Amino acid sequence: MGGGDLNMKKSWHPVLLVNQERVWKAEKVANEEKKMLAQLRKEREEERQLEELHRLQEASTGKKRVEKLDWMYAAPSTEGGALGGARIGERDMEEYLLGKKRVDEVLGQGDKNIGAASREFIALQNANTARDTAAKIREDPLLAIKKQEQAALAALMNRPDIRKQLRAAKKAKETKGREGESKEERKARKRAEKEERRKSKHRYHDSRSPPSDYYDDRDHRRHRDSYDSQDRENRRTYRDRSDRSRTRSESPKREKKEKDYSNRDRDYRRRNDTTRGSFDESPRKGGGNRWGSHGPDGYRRSDHRDDGFRERQRGDRIPPPRHLSYNHSTPDVRPSSPPSSSAAPVNRNTSTLEDQRAARLAAMSASADELYSSRSKSLAARAEEERREQEKDEKMRQKYGKEQASANFFSQQSQLGLGEALQRRGGKGLLKDI
């Protein structure tokens, strides 16, 4: 009978599971210890690096870093120690030991010394000198970009084609802004520009030549032209207003009033033209040929009778073209000052011309006042009629409109009885009374 391997029955044999478990546990403890040692070595290395960084920071800033527990041992001593290397004398040390001097005073003095040293260190660096500031400005990238943009813009503005395009764009913008204006605004703008040009030209002539009868007559003609243009503008405005009111409401009474007003306006223009023609004919009746005070050669004579001719010429040019024209063969009037032959005829003709102007102005003022009064009366009557029509429309709307229906509905609801109201809640009789 075979006995097998007897060594397998020994307690020290490595094949036994008990021995293998003991070896595994020992190896496990050894591995854990190695790991702990490696971790401790790593932590110490990190602490050493951190202390090195703190030391470099203290050297650069000059401020000593206080450890977490150093404040417990901070006390004055003759060797410095926790005071950052600051030493005190034996007398101060004796006073501290006897309780005559506090520790915080010595520590505060040390902190002041450290702060002063750091400020001196920063002042010695010269970080904000004029040269450094100029260098920073010179090396600024945003400033360099801005300078490049300004140089490019200046180069573009020096080119004639670019400047021509800019002027064209500006002109197009102004034209576009004028496109939105109405016809009346455009006429008013052109009239203002024309008046400004005339004033500048008048100032130029006044500064270069003395006043004369020609300029006085021209001023009177300008005054009458402005009055006529204002009258035409008023008639145009009234005509537009009449058209708008006619589109709003076509009433027979309103049409009749507008027709009467247009007839009165036509009569006023006819009377004004007749008055103007009579005043314009007065110099002709006084004497002179059809050339006025000018001869066939076109030169002015010395009797000052060309004023009447100019008045007739202007009276034929200003009104509508239904009047006769007297200047079809008259040469151009030259505003040259005439050589006076005698003083008495000049004064007489001047006084006659002034009387004519005064009479004409009085007639024009009377006609304008009459037209204004008639127009005011017509506008007041029209406003009163419109107010009456509006009141009538309001009454009709209140009588047959939604307000009356809603009022009738609530009044009927308040007059209903309890039984009828309950029936209506159930859906009966909803269309009987409404």
From Swiss-Prot:
Species: Cryptococcus neoformans var. neoformans serotype D (strain JEC21 / ATCC MYA-565) (Filobasidiella neoformans)
Function of the molecule: Involved in pre-mRNA splicing.
Record-given protein name: Pre-mRNA-splicing factor CWC25
Subcellular location field: Nucleus
Keyword list, A-Z: Coiled coil, mRNA processing, mRNA splicing, Nucleus, Spliceosome
Database matches in InterPro entries: CIR_N_dom, CWC25, CWC25_splicing_factor
Family: Belongs to the CWC25 family.
Single biological process term from Gene Ontology: mRNA splicing, via spliceosome
GO CC list: Prp19 complex; U2-type spliceosomal complex
Sequence ranges of Low complexity compositional bias: 359-381
Subunit-structure text: Associated with the spliceosome.
Comp. bias intervals (Basic and acidic residues): 43-57, 171-198, 215-284, 297-319, 382-402
UniProt superkingdom: Eukaryota
One protein family per Pfam: CWC25
Parts forming coiled coils: 20-61
Annotated segments matching region Disordered: 43-63, 156-412
